Amino acid sequence: NSGCNGGNRLLTWQYYQKSGIVSDSCYPYTAGKGNVEACRTACVSGEAWKKYKATNVKTLSNPTQIKNALMEGGPIHTGFTVYDDFMEYSGGIYEYVSGSSLGGHAVVIVGWGVEAGTSYWIVQNSWGPEWGENGYFIIKEGECSFDTYAVTGNPVV
């Protein structure tokens, strides 16, 4: 919604529901250094510009709701507060230890688990496969406001 200045997960999903979005092969995500290119109106792949919409968009505000939604429909869109120490993550269950807040960051929850009595989320990041654990990380349940405002919906194909 606001480019490099952040956005709102629910508004993003409501746009997806009302206006639709194109496929990743049509308009692939490109990581950058904060420069936002003009929006395209044609697919880079040469395929037809077809928009897909979503239904049943809803917010989830606790771990039980998120786990149920994962089992019912797949990945969940969420965000959390990123701190300095998260930038050094390379594996294991992340727990905030120290550092300043760097702002919010949107990610996708793909699963959960428990290790030595600690509940955690398995998460796909958008920083590429060289970061974290092949582009994924594990974060302690409840850490950094992680599971208090997630959004899900069902794609219409």
Label every PLM stretch briefly.
Residues 1-157:
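Catalytic-core signature of thiol
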